Amino acid sequence: MTDPATASSEARVYTVVGFAGSLRRGSYNRALLRAAIELAPPELHIETHELDALPLYNGDVEAAGVPQSVEELRAAIRQADALLIATPEYNHGVPGVLKNAIDWSSRPPRGSALNGKAAAVMGASPGTTGTARSQSQLRPAFVFTNTYALLQPEVLVARAHEKFDADGRLVDQATRDFLATFLQRFAEFIGRFTT
């Protein structure tokens, strides 16, 4: 039996699978994901998942047997309470590696790992719009996959080369504070979709 005196102090911890839509080791979005892990409130436990082993989506490959890397991604998403996606912006759009991960995760349609999951999107870019376009293009995919995306606040880290140091650590205090606020809001948002 739970002691009522301690029950209110025991907060639920949500497991979040996080991935960056960049394969580059020095990616600002990988760095942003590391910063999110560092700044996450106690209610969030963020585990990263790499996307570099995923083959391009191909229905023939799927029909012949789902690749192990895809099964691992799907399992990580299914076991998590939510997703945290750090997206770059390539040519004003969503990077192929990220769209590919969404495509594989949404298959098969009736067994989608994304169905009913809470998600949040953030991004960092050396440009002045901070991945606004790629984020706005990514969100409609969540409508089809029945994934519930946090809409506000938006983490659009512009001029990322000025916000991260040479080791990839987020050093801009205003951005750190905003990211911490975003993560707290995300934890509250996840609570609406889990029991």
Q: What role is predicted for each listed range?
A:
Residues 51-68, 163:
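N-terminal beta-loop-helix "entrance" segment that forms/cooperates
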Residues 2-17, 58, 148-195:
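Glycine-rich phosphate/pyrophosphate-binding loop and the adjoining helix
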Residues 10-42:
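N-terminal beta1-alpha1 ligand-phosphate binding loop
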Residues 19-20, 49, 122:
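Short hydrophobic segments within beta-strands
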Residues 65-146:
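Helix-loop-strand module that forms the ligand-binding subsite of alpha/beta enzymes
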Residues 16, 29, 33, 70, ...:
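A general structural signal for well-ordered alpha-helical segments in protein cores
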Residues 41-48, 148:
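A generic structural motif
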